[in-house]
């Protein structure tokens, strides 16, 4: 089963190196594949910092998060919490 949710980027600088690293590090704790899709359809695996940077998503943009795997629900909740916290940057 796959779980999905859309979130809005709330941190001032959007998806840049620091948030990408935080997300990458967070994903190491979960047995799940997590994909992020921006509003232009670009997809990035959450376990790839380079792919996350390619999302080129600024503050206010929508990101769809999709998780699949044994810990998909937990992984999705953790990613949503990180986005909602503005990656602890603000």
Swiss-Prot record:
Its main location: cytoplasm. It is found in: Cytoplasm. InterPro entries: HPr (IPR050399), HPr-like (IPR000032), HPr-like_sf (IPR035895), PTS_HPr_His_P_site (IPR001020), PTS_HPr_Ser_P_site (IPR002114). Keywords: Cytoplasm, Phosphotransferase system. It holds the Pfam family PTS-HPr. GO terms for cellular component: cytoplasm. The active site is at 16 (pros-phosphohistidine intermediate). CDD domains: PTS-HPr_like. Residues 2-90 form the HPr domain. GO terms for biological process: phosphoenolpyruvate-dependent sugar phosphotransferase system. The keyword Oxidoreductase does not apply. SUPFAM superfamilies: HPr-like (SSF55594). Coiled coil: none annotated. Belongs to the HPr family. Component of the phosphoenolpyruvate-dependent nitrogen-metabolic phosphotransferase system (nitrogen-metabolic PTS), that seems to be involved in regulating nitrogen metabolism. The phosphoryl group from phosphoenolpyruvate (PEP) is transferred to the phosphoryl carrier protein NPr by enzyme I-Ntr. Phospho-NPr then transfers it to EIIA-Ntr. Could function in the transcriptional regulation of sigma-54 dependent operons in conjunction with the NPr (PtsO) and EIIA-Ntr (PtsN) proteins. This is Phosphocarrier protein NPr. It comes from Klebsiella oxytoca. The gene is ptsO.
């Amino acid at each position: 089963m796959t779980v999905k949710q859309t979130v809005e980027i709330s941190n001032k600088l959007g998806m840049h190196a620091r948030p990408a690293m935080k997300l990458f590090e967070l994903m190491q704790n979960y047995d799940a594949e997590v994909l992020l899709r921006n509003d232009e359809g670009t997809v990035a695996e959450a376990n790839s910092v380079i792919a996350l940077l390619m999302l080129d998503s600024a503050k206010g943009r929508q990101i769809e998060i999709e998780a699949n795997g044994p810990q998909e629900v937990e992984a999705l909740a953790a990613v949503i919490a990180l986005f909602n916290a503005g990656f602890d940057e603000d």
